[in-house]
Amino acid sequence: HCLLYGVTTAHVLAVEVVLPDGEVVVLGAEEGRAAGYDLRGAFVGGEGTLGIATRICVRLTEDPPEVATLLLDFDLVAGAADTVSAVIAAGIVPAALEIMDQRVVEAVEPFVHAGYPLDAAAVLIVELDGLPAGVAEAIARIETIGTAHGARTVRVAADEDERARIWKGRKSAFGAIAVIKPDYYLNDTVIPRTRLAEVLARVYEVIEERDLIVMNVFHAGDGNLHPLIVFDAREPGVMERVLDAGEEIV
């Protein structure tokens, strides 16, 4: 949900750290008014490579009064990608905008039973939150935008159970790749939202040219792509093709 709420570092006020030489320091300030270089942000961004956190002071965010989760499905991946760009261009900032392509849907649906349409080229998960009137208005606008870009259906989760099932599929995506192949190579890249459709089309071309399989599941709202090249490392020569594809994608 970093599209609306920001990444982890935005919610960490201070952190007590043990550095590699054993020194214990506090980075940031619990009252959120530390001066100088943002060493707290650098440490959080280092994802564990700069030391060990022993205490963390975080900023808590109040739960919104209204939350709605939408599921849109498309015949074309480009339609889902273009919908994301159009939603943001319309001034709507959802809490989350996530896309899963058909291979991902086929892998997760048998386990989570979220009701993802197996014949869809892509599904788009949209989460909205805020005041009830604002959420209702955003739902209506997104339905219009999605339909204009080829959405076959726009489904609004009816209750918390349905919301949880829709999200369980997204959160289970990486684990479900074992259904397809035992190994994977992950690219973690960021591109402009306006080029999502173009870049995804090229990713599929690169994979097809090398006779490989890719599964796309990603944070579409901020253009953060995670092309998962899945393969069996026991296959002779496959690693070379995978690495070549990964380099070309990046």
Each language-model region and where it sits:
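FAD-binding subdomain of flavoenzyme oxidoreductases
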Residues: H1-E98
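C-terminal substrate-recognition/cap domain of FAD-linked oxidoreductases
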Residues: V58-E62, A68, D73-A245
